[in-house]
From Swiss-Prot:
InterPro entries given in the database record: ATP_synth_B-like_membr_sf, ATP_synth_b/b'su_bac/chlpt, ATP_synth_F0_bsu_bac
SUPFAM superfamilies xrefs: F1F0 ATP synthase subunit B, membrane domain
Organism: Nostoc punctiforme (strain ATCC 29133 / PCC 73102)
Localization (cell): Cellular thylakoid membrane
Any single Pfam family the record assigns to this protein: ATP-synt_B
GO annotation, cellular component aspect: plasma membrane-derived thylakoid membrane; proton-transporting ATP synthase complex
Summary of subunit composition and partner proteins: F-type ATPases have 2 components, F(1) - the catalytic core - and F(0) - the membrane proton channel. F(1) has five subunits: alpha(3), beta(3), gamma(1), delta(1), epsilon(1). F(0) has four main subunits: a(1), b(1), b'(1) and c(10-14). The alpha and beta chains form an alternating ring which encloses part of the gamma chain. F(1) is attached to F(0) by a central stalk formed by the gamma and epsilon chains, while a peripheral stalk is formed by the delta, b and b' chains.
Gene Ontology MF term list: proton-transporting ATP synthase activity, rotational mechanism
Protein name: ATP synthase subunit b
Function: F(1)F(0) ATP synthase produces ATP from ADP in the presence of a proton or sodium gradient. F-type ATPases consist of two structural domains, F(1) containing the extramembraneous catalytic core and F(0) containing the membrane proton channel, linked together by a central stalk and a peripheral stalk. During catalysis, ATP synthesis in the catalytic domain of F(1) is coupled via a rotary mechanism of the central stalk subunits to proton translocation.
Keywords per UniProt: ATP synthesis, CF(0), Hydrogen ion transport, Ion transport, Membrane, Thylakoid, Transmembrane, Transmembrane helix, Transport
Length: 190
C-alpha cells in the first residue's frame, strides 16, 4: 500500500471519527470539531503528526527497500560490466590469435604453392630432357639401322657384281692384277 493509500485510509478514519464526535458534541458531551474548514490548523497539525508518525516507518521502509534494490541493481550492473569487459578482452585476444593463425596459414599456403610450382617446373624440365634424350636415342638407333641396311645392301650389290663378273670370267691380266693386289695386302712381295 502506497502513501496515497495510507493518506486515504487516514482521511476516511478521520471522517468516521468526526461524525462520531459531532454526534457526541450535539448530545452535550465533549467532542472534537474535525471540520477541516473550521479547525484547519489543529486538524492539519494532527493529520501531519499522524502521517509523520505512521508514514515515517512506511516511508523509511519503502525508501530503504528502494535503496537496497538500487544498490543491488548497481552491483549487478557493475558485475555484468566486469564480465562484459573480461569477455571483450578474451574475444579481442581470440581475434588476434585467429588473425595470426590466418596469416600463418596464408603464408604457409603461399610457400606451399611456390614449392609446388618449382617442383612442377623441375619435373617439366626433366620430362623435356628425357624426351630429348629419348628422341636422340631413337634417332641414333634409326641412323645406325639405316647405315647397317645400307652397308648390307652395298655388300649384297658388291657380291652380286663380283659374282656376275666371276661368272663372265675374268681376263687373264685382270686376274693377275687381282692376285698381286691380294698378296700385297697380305704383306707379301711379288
Amino acid at each position: 500500500m502506497g502513501i496515497m493509500g495510507t493518506f486515504l485510509l487516514l482521511a476516511a478514519e478521520a471522517n468516521a471519527v468526526h461524525s462520531e464526535l459531532a454526534e457526541g458534541a450535539a448530545e452535550g458531551g465533549f467532542g472534537l470539531n474535525l471540520d477541516i474548514f473550521e479547525t484547519n490548523l489543529i486538524n492539519l497539525a494532527i493529520l501531519v503528526g499522524i502521517l509523520f508518525y505512521f508514514g515515517r516507518k512506511v516511508l523509511s521502509n519503502i525508501l530503504n527497500e528502494r535503496q537496497s534494490n538500487i544498490a543491488t541493481a548497481i552491483q549487478e550492473a557493475e558485475g555484468r560490466l566486469k564480465e562484459a569487459k573480461t569477455a571483450l578482452s578474451q574475444a579481442q585476444e581470440q581475434l588476434k590469435q585467429s588473425q595470426a593463425e590466418a596469416e600463418r596459414i596464408r603464408q604457409s599456403a603461399v610457400e606451399n604453392a611456390q614449392k609446388a610450382k618449382e617442383a612442377l617446373l623441375a619435373k617439366a624440365v626433366q620430362d623435356v630432357e628425357r624426351l630429348k634424350q629419348t628422341a636422340a636415342a631413337d634417332l641414333n638407333t634409326e641412323t645406325e639401322r639405316a647405315i647397317a641396311q645400307l652397308r648390307q645392301r652395298v655388300a649384297t650389290l658388291a657380291l652380286q657384281k663380283v659374282e656376275s663378273q666371276l661368272k663372265g670370267g675374268i681376263a687373264d691380266d685382270a686376274q693377275q692384277s687381282l692376285i698381286d693386289r691380294s698378296i700385297a695386302q697380305l704383306g707379301g712381295n711379288v
